[in-house]
Amino acid sequence: MDQKIQSLPAKKNIALVAHDGKKAALKLWCIKHLNALSEHTLYATGTTGHLINKTTGLDVIQLLSGPMGGDQQLGAKIAEHEIHMLVFFWDPLASQPHDPDVKALLRLAAVWNIPVACNEVSADMLLSSPLMNVELERTLPDYEKYLATRQIDI
């Protein structure tokens, strides 16, 4: 598939997600990085967003709870280029009833070329990157061009 270039703004839209067993770790990470996170627009699945807002005072756009469709809402926002970074503290040792939604979310992050942090260290590295607060370009699949050239025989 052909590629196109898209600019990401200096002020990023960051999605915050955590499985139940990792919510405390994400909360502490948000407290640790309160100042840096306040410079960006934050999105989160419902329970996680409520917890972060309540404990940090950060403004968080809260979607549905992950198992109730919040993971899919975030996936749609990634596909629509509204999310620029995903911080997802997932629990690799616990089975999740919405595992297919989680896999779809991570797949969309890979398709649309957004950085993903799955634990505190990777999230620290992304947030402290010199690219975090500057405009930057990324390559994306050129889906519109693909659709324009696609032929379907009926």
Swiss-Prot record:
The MGS-like domain covers: 6-154
Q: Which UniProt keywords apply?
A: Lyase
Enzyme Commission designation: 4.2.3.3
Kindly state which reaction or reactions the protein catalyses: dihydroxyacetone phosphate = methylglyoxal + phosphate
What's an example GO BP annotation here?
methylglyoxal biosynthetic process
**GO cellular component terms attached to this protein's record:** cytosol
Active site (UniProt): D71 (proton donor/acceptor)
List, in alphabetical order, the Gene Ontology terms for molecular function in this entry. methylglyoxal synthase activity
Which residues are noted in the entry as substrate-binding?
A: H19, K23, T45, G46, T47, T48, S65, G66, H98
Q: What InterPro entries does the annotation carry?
A: Methylgl_synth (IPR004363), Methylglyoxal_synth_AS (IPR018148), MGS-like_dom (IPR011607), MGS-like_dom_sf (IPR036914)
What is this protein's function? Catalyzes the formation of methylglyoxal from dihydroxyacetone phosphate.
Family designation: Belongs to the methylglyoxal synthase family.
Q: What is this protein called?
A: Methylglyoxal synthase
Q: Which gene encodes it?
A: mgsA
